[in-house]
Amino acid sequence: MKIQYSLLLFLLLLGFTQCKSPAAKEDRLSDDALMDTVQRRTFNYFWEGAEPNSGLARERIHIDGVYPENDQNVITSGGSGFGIMAILAGIDRGYVTRQEGLERMEKIVSFLETADRFHGAYPHWWYGDTGKVKPFGQKDNGGDLVETAFLMQGLLAVHQYYINGNEKEKALAAKIDELWHGMEFDWYRNGNQNVLYWHWSPNYGWEMNFPLEGYNECLITYILAASSPTHSVPAACYHEGWARSGGIKSASKPYGYPLELKHNGAEEKGGPLFWAHYSYIGLDPRNLTDQYANYWNVVRNHAMSDYQYCVTNPKGYKGYGPDCWGLTASYSINGYSAHMPDNDLGVITPTAALSSFPYTPEESMAALKGFYKQGSWIWGKYGFYDAFSPNEKWTVPHYLAIDQCTIAPMIENHR
């Protein structure tokens, strides 16, 4: 099903199958059944694991119940946007009914109508029981334009899913329109500069000082800003800000795969793989081009270079190979880290390969089978745990929304 909204092409290719039992042996499962198994469990992170008052995604779910920051009821805007698109996949896969999906979305939108918002942008985190902002950092206690763009990407997909339905479904779409029209992208130019800014705080103003320049996960923010019917920004913001007046172009070719765009802070070998996922869950990169790059090549080559790096395994970590690859930001042996070739700590994050299914179907399927064969030490209630180290035989039974919630919709985009 192609979902188009204004200048955006939101793509969810949705089919109908029954999910097979997750307890089935991998060698008895077809590729489709194995994808069903993983989609169903990761879908449940957002469905069964949602914070009950808001219906939104918890920032993290720790199966062992250990929450050092006492943040088990903190919810996330960006991760929820990914989870919202997982609901659409879940409806058409038969995990929940269309009516159940509608009721969950009504709860979510009702929460968003009254939750803390700053010139149309939501914070990175809220307290789920109150809708009040939970600071992400000392000065990061206001609007987060990028995380809101990820959330709105999901809401617009839901808008198109229900817009031609019954009266309740049309009413939901109308409420989403109001949230969409309220996003003040023009405010986040910080005084009409030709660039968007990531943060604004009612207490600290623009002190975070993070302009959205150069290639990372943020493309969808500029696409939405350009297509806003109420608070759009001029093309100069994209060209001078995001594209750095042409400075975004790259000649780097790790393992023979041209990156085409300079990855911020990782220009030679490429950044963490979530950069190839977050903006493209709803935005179809096929045939998406501008004067700087072909975005299908950008995301596919990023994934393939990451795959080839792990297969080549220059640091000699145990376990790396064609069926065990994928570097991205996740939990790590010591805290949290943005894993990538220039920051390879021997930690594999399953979402890196699994959310790359649209770009690397054969390589991602090999990884899926390889992860599944490893068994219960990395597999739990909501699918594969956030990260593991085959070299150190390390994992923890922890999940993060921004990793888990991309898997089901990106596998669906592939299917």
Residues of each region from the PLM?
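Bacterial Sec-dependent N-terminal signal peptides
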Residues: 1-26
